[in-house]
Curated annotation (Swiss-Prot):
One GO CC term, this protein: large ribosomal subunit
Region Disordered, annotated ranges: 223-274
PANTHER family: LARGE RIBOSOMAL SUBUNIT PROTEIN UL2M, RIBOSOMAL PROTEIN L2
Taxonomic lineage: Bacteria, Pseudomonadati, Pseudomonadota, Gammaproteobacteria, Alteromonadales
Subunit structure, interactors included: Part of the 50S ribosomal subunit. Forms a bridge to the 30S subunit in the 70S ribosome.
UniProt name for this protein: Large ribosomal subunit protein uL2
Species this protein is from: Shewanella amazonensis (strain ATCC BAA-1098 / SB2B)
InterPro entries found in the cross-reference section: NA-bd_OB-fold (IPR012340), Rib_uL2_dom2 (IPR014722), Ribosomal_uL2 (IPR002171), Ribosomal_uL2_bac/org-type (IPR005880), Ribosomal_uL2_C (IPR022669), Ribosomal_uL2_CS (IPR022671), Ribosomal_uL2_dom3 (IPR014726), Ribosomal_uL2_RNA-bd_dom (IPR022666)
Entry's family note: Belongs to the universal ribosomal protein uL2 family.
Length: 274
């Protein structure tokens, strides 16, 4: 994997920094694991905008990823690594001994030809998936379930990982990248190793159009709007907003805590540090 800084042949190329991975498959994805992905433009079924800054972008197929890793005891071979436009991580196409193919998240160091397996008897090796009760304390894992059998929810983006710091009874304690310490049932599965493509954070798109290719529309500042559109809007000339930062609906923002799910607070041993 290489980090390439483009030559400034035009203003739009001047700031571009690309991540080039020669190990990625250059052909089409495996057709049997693709699904239709329709554009919403950020609108719901009534036509109202429910998610701002969404619209346009290149047409994409969704890749069906195996987040459950429930094909126990059947060894699989990594056929190839692929780019996935739907996530920051790369994905790996696995061919299992029974002939089935599945996509999984590509772990750091994973290459074509590697063997992976899941289940309670799997070796402690990068890419293998096991229940947390069978993973040694101190191990680094990714793609962690929060409920047994539901599928991975924690640490799925590029470069992400969590560490198993303790195991007590029916719960394992995990340290997340944010600094949060969280309890998860020991029957939940996790995949050993870190998610690959950690260099993703170093890329620079270089121009606004590259964001538009990805389906991201511009973000307009509240102080640039009219009073009818935003609490910060209006005023003669340029103003600073005149109040603490709020969303277009008047809810405080920029650091204001909105978590109110007290039902699951008991699973958080220590809140995140930021």
């Amino acid at each position: 994997m290489a980090i390439v800084k483009c030559k400034p042949t035009s203003p739009g190329r001047r700031g571009v920094v690309k991540i080039v991975n020669s190990d990625l498959h250059k052909g089409k994805p495996f057709a049997g694991l693709l699904a239709k992905k329709s554009k919403t433009g950020g609108r719901n079924n009534t036509g109202r905008i429910t998610t701002r800054h969404v619209g346009g972008g290149h047409k994409q197929h969704y890749r069906l990823i195996d987040f459950k890793r429930n094909k126990d005891g059947i060894p699989g071979k990594i056929e190839r690594l692929e780019y996935d436009p739907n996530r920051t991580a790369n994905i790996a196409l696995v061919l299992y001994a029974d002939g089935e193919r599945r996509y999984i998240l590509a772990a750091k160091g994973m290459q074509a030809g590697d063997k992976v397996v899941s289940g309670i008897d799997a070796d402690i090796k990068v890419g293998n998936a096991l229940p947390l009760r069978n993973i040694p304390v101190g191990s680094v894992v990714h793609a962690v379930e929060m409920k047994p059998g539901k599928g991975a929810q924690i640490a799925r983006s590029a470069g992400a990982y969590v560490q198993v710091v303790a195991r007590d009874g029916e719960y394992a304690t995990l340290r997340l990248r944010s600094g949060e310490m969280r309890k998860v049932p020991v029957d939940c599965r996790a995949t050993l190793g870190e998610v690959g493509n950690a260099e993703h954070m170093l890329r620079q798109l270089g121009k606004a159009g590259a964001k538009r290719w990805r389906g991201v529309r511009p973000t307009v500042r509240g102080v640039a709007m009219n009073p009818v559109d935003h609490p910060h809007g209006g005023g003669e000339g340029r103003t600073s907003g005149g109040r603490h930062p709020v969303t277009p609906w008047g809810v405080p923002t920029k650091g204001y805590k909105t978590r109110s799910n007290k039902r699951t607070d008991k699973y958080i041993v220590r809140r995140r540090t930021k």
